[in-house]
Every structure is written in structure tokens, then in C-alpha cells.
Amino acid sequence: MKVAVLGFGTVGAGIYEMLANAKGLEQGPVLVRPGKDDAPFKRTSMEAILAEPGVEAVAEAMGGIEPAFSYAMAALKAGKHFVTSNKALVAAHGIELAAAAREKGVGFLFSAACGGGMPFLHNLSIAVESDLIVSLGGILNGTTNYMLDAMQRRSLGYAEALSDAQRLGYAEADPSADVSGLDALRKIVLSAAVAYDLLPVEGLCHEGIESITAEDVKRIQARGLSCRLMAKCGPAAGGKVYAYVEPVLFPASAPECSVLDLSLIHI
């Protein structure tokens, strides 16, 4: 199967390299911005990508909602499988994209958007075939988890913990989606879509860690507790689904507190 790649940044280049050694897959054309010369087999329009002979799948590595959404719809309507790790795209337009994929009988795959290297969404999609999911949630953002742990174990202030996370590559140059809880909210929304075949879009609440200070941490620890940013979703009245993200206090011995810079998901 020949796979086209949209974008040739760190993620796109990594996908292209992986395709060279993946059994049953073949490197296809790469969509890049005009003037970007370092991409192999490059094309500068989605029309050229879709017209390329033999392309059966498209892997999106651009990020953001547009033009990723327009490109995704074009690929699906052209009968191409579409793969993405773009949680913002899926959270905003997942229902439309899934419907377009079903109409054409192709795959719309987004497991990489939640859980990092864990095949969480794939396994969840299998579980819902035979089990009722009463609720699910957990620690879905490694950046904030690292920061909270640094503030608690190493007595760093918020700004110091954020700077440390950026230096080590946990946090991006613009960490706002992470620290505000928006990244975790997008991931729990995707999880809810798989678990309940419904996107919770109304009245979603997310509280991040920006307001947590070193003094807060001292008071929390004095009570034998520890803080983690938790996401949760489940069925609600009226056939709806709830989803939220907020800091939660746990006993310091709780399993959640042993997770330092990774994710933890419970169903």
C-alpha cells in the first residue's frame, strides 16, 4: 500500500522514514508548503497528492484544524484511507470525517491521537464490542504530569517546572494547550467518541494547572496528598455524554501518584 504524507516536519519526516522499513507499505508523495525543498517526492497541492497513481492511504502530520480538515475530507471522498494523530482535528470534526469514511468504505484511523505509544483507542474499540463502559479516564497529558511531579518532588515553582519540561522536550514552545487542560480534554473527548459513539461537545469544562503555586503544593503535601491532572468521561442523562478535566488530589500512596511523566488510563 502506497501512503502519502501531509507535512514534513518532525512527525511527517518520521512517518516517511518509517514507511521505508514497514512491511506491506510504500513511501508515497509528500505534501509540503511551496518553497520547502528538503522533502523527497514532494508535491505542493492536495490535488497532486490524490492524483498520484497507486496512493491508497494518506497520513496527516500537519497539525491544526485547517487545512488539515479540508485535506482529510478530500482524501476520504477520493476513497483513500486517512490516518492522523491530530487530536484537535478529530475532536472538532471527528463525526463528519467518520461519516465520510463509512460512505466510501475506507478507514479513518486516529488511535495515535490519544495515549501516546499505548494502543488505547484501538483496544477500547474492541472492548466496546462486548462490554458496557461505565466510565473511563486518567492522566492523559504527560507534560502537566511531569510538571506537577517536579513541583512536588523537587519543590520547583510553576515557572521553573514549565521551563524544565520545555528544556527536556516534554512541553512545546507554546504549552498553553497542555497546561490549560485543553490537550487532555481533546483526548478524553476522542475516548468518549470511541466508547459511546458520541462526541460530548456541550458544556465541557477543563481546568488546568496554571493556578497551582508552590505554596499550594506545600499545603497539599502537608496533608499527605498529591495532585494529578485527571480527565474523565461517561454516560449522562438524556443519552448524552459528560467529559471534563480538572486537578484532583490523591493520597500520596495512590497508583496515580506513581506515574511520573507518562499517561495512565483506567476503564
Predicted feature locations:
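Rossmann-fold NAD(P) dinucleotide-binding segment
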Residues: 46-57, 61, 65-85
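Substrate-binding/catalytic subdomain of NAD(P)-dependent oxidoreductase enzymes
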Residues: 162-255
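Rossmann-fold NAD(P)-binding glycine/threonine-rich loop
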Residues: 87-108, 121-124
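NAD(P)-binding Rossmann-fold cofactor-contacting core
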Residues: 22-39
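Short, ordered loop/turn segments at secondary-structure junctions
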Residues: 33-35, 63, 87-89, 95, ...
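Conserved small/polar residues in nucleotide/adenosyl-binding loops
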Residues: 265-267
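Conserved anion/nucleotide-ligand pocket segment
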Residues: 126-186
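Glycine-rich adenosine-cofactor-binding loop
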Residues: 2-17
